[in-house]
Curated annotation (Swiss-Prot):
This is Small ribosomal subunit protein uS2. GO terms for cellular component: cytosolic small ribosomal subunit; nucleus. Residues 251-270 are annotated as: Disordered. GO terms for biological process: ribosomal small subunit assembly; translation. Its main location: cytoplasm. Keywords: Cytoplasm, Developmental protein, Nucleus, Ribonucleoprotein, Ribosomal protein. It is found in: Cytoplasm; Nucleus. Required for the assembly and/or stability of the 40S ribosomal subunit. Required for the processing of the 20S rRNA-precursor to mature 18S rRNA in a late step of the maturation of 40S ribosomal subunits. Required during oogenesis and imaginal development. Pfam families: 40S_SA_C, Ribosomal_S2. The keyword Transcription regulation does not apply. One of its GO terms (molecular function) is ribosome binding. The gene is sta. The keyword 4Fe-4S does not apply. Residues 261-270 have a biased composition (Polar residues).
Amino acid sequence: MSGGLDILSLKEDDITKMLVATTHLGSENVNFQMEQYVYKRRADGVNIINLGKTWEKLVLAARAIVAIENASDVFVISSRPIGQRAVLKFAKYTDTTPIAGRFTPGAFTNQIQPAFREPRLLVVTDPMTDHQPIMEASYVNIPVIAFTNTDSPLRYIDIAIPCNNKSPHSIGLMWWLLAREVLRLRGTISRSIEWPVVVDLFFYRDPEEAEKEEAAAKELLPPPKIEEAVDHPVEETTNWADEVAAENVGGVEDWNEDTVKTSWGSDGQF
């Protein structure tokens, strides 16, 4: 499909990313409709996915997304926790509508409920866990794009992108590649320049592991410096009462020394 155009061909750097993220490793079971995407079967029973066909389907899915005039009419869905962060990041960079977490039954078919939506295209992370929106999309003729493993059912799925959708790194990488290809087809970014958004932003992070990393980072920090108390010389305080000379106060008259008159008369007699 993209083999005729060299500009759309799979690059070596992208192949390396897929191999490191174990995108090529499928499950031990194979759905009969997914046999065309299986390259071979390993001795331990794990099926190897053909990454060339994975890339062709990814480019086809990106072209379908770009064909929608209003990007908000494209709904990206992930009920599994490992794909919720990738879905939110994809929606942020492509202006699509995310549904991360539990899907409300009847959102595409029940016009009475407030959560009713009418999307024009769905992109789901796993056909098994996201079976409810896929089923409702089939009732109202909404095309569906899905990341599928070797054992995923392809019922009501229009474009299947074969990959390892059970690995957090693999599913994060696939959403990152799809977002980059959508932006390239829109002309937002150039193919000659590397996309500055790193793929790590699309990876799922376990909350417990994130807390452990933060705690380990705090332990590596140097301890805060404690300022030692400096002994300053204590100045001698002087008693101002001693320096001030006592003022000489005049003699105090004793009022008892005055002669007490015993009569109201002029001579003092009764």
